[in-house]
């Protein structure tokens, strides 16, 4: 069974750095990459049709980000990732995905180059850090391409 590196992607630069790291790591270890994008539900909107339109717009934006990022890693690492788009709470989406896949070797998250590392990094390295069935790899968002290549 191939090792799968799970990357949670959003529109942040550090998420794209984490994706490039995971792609290079997977290519070097004959592994695979799962790209998980999460569409978060909007706060209550009085009209259901408006809420559905807002969520669909967010979904299309995230799918565009994923498509652009996937193009980068396909050309750089020569692998085709599995793309999963889920709706809901990001923490629950990550746990749900990992819970359905026995081949996830690591959760790969990008940390912001400065300030708060991001909500998923904070969650999965905080109070519940020991509850995942796989390690968490935190990739600094400030790494250069050369550093990514060396470390992967």
Locate predicted features.
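Short, solvent-exposed amphipathic alpha-helices that sit
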Residues: 21, 58-69, 93
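General small-molecule cofactor/ligand-binding pocket signal
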Residues: 34-36, 82-86, 137-139
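Structural beta-alpha unit
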Residues: 75-107, 150-152
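Short, well-ordered secondary-structure micro-motifs
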Residues: 18, 45-48, 95-96, 119-120, ...
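Glycine-rich, Arg-bearing micro-motifs that act as flexible, cationic patches
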Residues: 106-132, 143-149
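Active-site phosphate/pyrophosphate- and oxyanion-stabilizing loops and adjacent acidic/basic residues
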Residues: 23, 71, 96, 126
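Small/aliphatic-rich secondary-structure junction motif
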Residues: 2-49, 131-134
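Acidic, proline/glycine-rich short linear motifs
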Residues: 37-64, 146-152
């Amino acid at each position: 069974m191939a090792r799968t590196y799970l990357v949670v992607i959003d529109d942040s630069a550090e998420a794209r750095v984490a994706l490039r790291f995971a792609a290079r790591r997977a290519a070097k270890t004959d592994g695979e990459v799962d790209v998980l994008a999460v569409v978060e539900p909007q706060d209550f909107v009085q009209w259901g049709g408006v809420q559905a339109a807002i969520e669909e717009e967010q979904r299309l934006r995230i799918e565009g980000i994923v498509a652009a990022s996937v193009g980068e890693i396909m050309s750089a690492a020569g692998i085709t990732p599995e793309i999963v788009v889920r709706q809901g709470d990001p923490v629950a989406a990550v746990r749900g995905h990992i819970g359905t896949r026995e081949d996830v070797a690591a959760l790969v998250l990008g940390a912001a180059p400065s300030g708060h590392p991001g909500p998923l990094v904070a969650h999965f390295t905080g109070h519940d850090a020991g509850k995942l069935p796989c390690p968490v790899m935190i990739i600094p968002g400030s790494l250069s391409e050369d550093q990514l290549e060396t470390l992967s």
